[in-house]
């Protein structure tokens, strides 16, 4: 009895005297593709809805959806994030083998980077559009805009989806919405969840930016402007109570803010409108320089 009392007292002392746990350091950079440190800053799972969690980093979205039959992950961030994502699965009380599906938005290293490692370690199946499947299989090489500058480990897609196709897992239906532009194979996803028991429609819309892209007379992507226009309209029409995007700041999210992360989150319409304004300004500048 005396030993138990001493043990409890010692435990209480250690708890009170322990220093505040500091934030973990950022994940290491890749020599070939360096990014902002916040893109690599780990974070613990952040609740978005009752069964949907952000488990990526402060500036890269990776959404974990917990279903009645395993887990679904929408995007994964950078290649070096695989172990971090698996650690966050464990924080949620799951094992790697519980991951069933990897849903892709687009085939860039900062979103599909860890898919190969995750597929290998969990057995999860990769789902993407046909255009993205080609890019995923070659690890981002010969990209329309970036060439071989942002490579990632190649991964074979297990299921190719069409626009409007539904992917069902454990009672949750994920609908694919084609939104080409940022890449020809870009996809957004919508599904239903609850928040505090009330129904909520979630939309994960793909990036609508055109970073350094040639928009006029692009020989490798001649329909790029038309595709962006169509995608702006697609995003506006999504069933959308809560919007999330691969880069959270573009849709008003601040994952570092914890419980207040979505305080300034945009609607789907506001996101599409803001993206189209930026696109129009970029297009006008390109036209001006071409004169």
PLM features per residue range, with description:
Residues 51, 65, 75, 85, ...:
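Divalent metal-coordination and catalytic microenvironments
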Residues 80-83, 90-166, 263, 271:
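Active-site HxH/HxHxD metal-binding segment of metal-dependent hydrolases
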């Amino acid at each position: 009895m005396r030993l138990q009392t001493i043990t409890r007292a010692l435990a209480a002392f250690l708890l009170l005297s322990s220093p505040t746990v500091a934030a973990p350091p950022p994940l290491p950079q890749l020599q070939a593709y360096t990014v902002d440190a916040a893109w690599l800053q780990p974070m613990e799972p952040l609740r978005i809805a009752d069964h949907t969690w952000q488990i990526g980093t402060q500036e890269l979205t990776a959404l974990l959806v917990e279903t009645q039959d395993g887990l679904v992950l929408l995007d994964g961030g950078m290649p070096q994030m695989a172990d971090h994502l698996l650690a966050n699965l464990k924080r949620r009380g799951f094992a790697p083998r519980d991951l069933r599906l990897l849903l892709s938005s687009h085939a860039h290293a900062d979103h599909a980077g860890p898919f190969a490692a995750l597929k290998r370690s969990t057995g999860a199946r990769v789902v993407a559009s046909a255009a993205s499947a080609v890019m995923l299989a070659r690890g981002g090489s010969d990209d329309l805009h970036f060439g071989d500058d942002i490579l990632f480990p190649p991964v074979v897609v297990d299921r190719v989806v069409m626009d409007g196709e539904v992917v069902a897992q454990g009672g949750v239906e994920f609908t694919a919405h084609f939104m080409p532009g940022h890449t020809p194979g870009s996809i957004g996803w919508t599904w239903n969840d609850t928040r505090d028991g009330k129904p909520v429609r979630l939309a994960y819309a793909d990036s609508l930016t055109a970073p350094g892209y040639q928009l006029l007379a692009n020989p490798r992507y001649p329909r790029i402007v038309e595709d962006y226009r169509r995608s702006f309209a697609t995003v506006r029409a999504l069933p959308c109570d809560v919007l999330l995007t691969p880069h959270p700041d573009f849709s008003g999210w601040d994952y570092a803010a914890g419980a207040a992360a979505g305080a300034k989150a945009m609607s789907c319409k506001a996101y599409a409108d803001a993206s189209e304004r930026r696109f129009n300004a970029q297009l006008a500048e390109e036209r001006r320089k071409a004169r």
